[in-house]
């Protein structure tokens, strides 16, 4: 027996030695990471629903290029945006922090930046991952949508410009696409402004007529001065109501290259080729790396600008055409990487800034996305349909192909992940809410580092998620929007559901869902149906209190003072509103 035991010990020692030698000869993924810094390509869609993509369950929309990323990489199925609208979500993405920390929220209903000529924007004291990567020697570029502010005190100070937030190069829209850019019926601003101007015109016209009648009949002792002024203002308001659509197009629908306006207003038939041309140029120019390129697609936000060769090709109308065109754009970018020999040295990430819009509807025609099995959509801070988004990472030879991860992750996680990959350090002077995803992506960790995630609507906490490891994921809703009509799952007749006021419900006790068994949030749990109801509520409430203690008061960038149009802040390539320029000719 002793002889057998001794032989077994010898064999085990020999086996351990051989394994050590073999492991020393075979480089691991983690050792590859430690010895090389990848190029980083971030792709973000605008308003894309998680159910719009083939690899997330859509079998009628053709997205072969995005699907290929998932086949060759890692797909996240519980990937969460920090906000359900673009401005706060993008601020959180770039900084790794809840938007309430940077003040990129509102308390009065102005949930995104409303104008290019507003003073609000991503504060200059916020640190983006682009700033850190630039300091680490990366060439940094942003192509596409910004929508995080531009100017503070003058039309040329560009205090919120991407070039002041760590990007070496910018080409795209400082603002955002909107229905008004194409004079759509689905208008974000024009219709509302026309109604206000017409109302004020009627009031002033009535005042002027009353004063005239009173003066002529000697019933109102008044001079002609107030009569003339009220009549003049009435005429100006009437004129403004007729031209407000054109003013909005010139004010917001423009393209910039770095600090220079290149198109005002934009020629949409050339926009997609221009974006692709710019991406290819950046990749070729910086192929010796390392580089960080953030491609922030204008797709699939209304007015769904689509090239002629994609019109009518999908099974889902103009929205489907636009999604399929965006997927084609992804394919063109992947082809450029292949041609430049950059595929294996580039980490690619694909996502959307939030869920698809359900309220983008005219008659029976839907112009917004599909959020699959998840309740709600764009603008709803708590429901999964507004915040659960695609999340795909691909890095050939490093990340396992075809991997699917169901752990809770966040858009905010991109910040610490790319900073770590670049050899940088996450700031220690502020709270960073994102977590490094590398251990999860590589398979060296089985669980997400997010135990809790908070779900805000503007500055109001609507819900919280508790990931109870090895058990389940709980979701607690404190506030939910009132759907119109009741049970419709959306707020039809409005642009988005509100965050506060009469059109929301405050729940006491809060609503509880088990997302692991009920991802569609259809079965509300009660103390009678869930034995640990009170324990879950107590633990989540405690986590909320702990989170709130980490918040500090900051100026709200999206409130009224920072979110009104100021003529002296309006970027223009000529005297506004008589501005028109075309400084670059796109592909023919």
Swiss-Prot record:
GO molecular function, one term: arylsulfatase activity
Signal peptide per UniProt: 1-31
Binding site for Ca(2+): 46-47, 86, 353-354
UniProt keyword annotation of Calcium present: yes
Keyword Membrane among UniProt keywords: no
Biological role stated in the UniProt entry: Exhibits arylsulfatase activity towards the artificial substrate 4-methylumbelliferyl sulfate. May be essential for the correct composition of cartilage and bone matrix during development. Has no activity toward steroid sulfates.
Family in the record: Belongs to the sulfatase family.
Name by which UniProt lists this protein: Arylsulfatase L
Species: Macaca fascicularis (Crab-eating macaque)
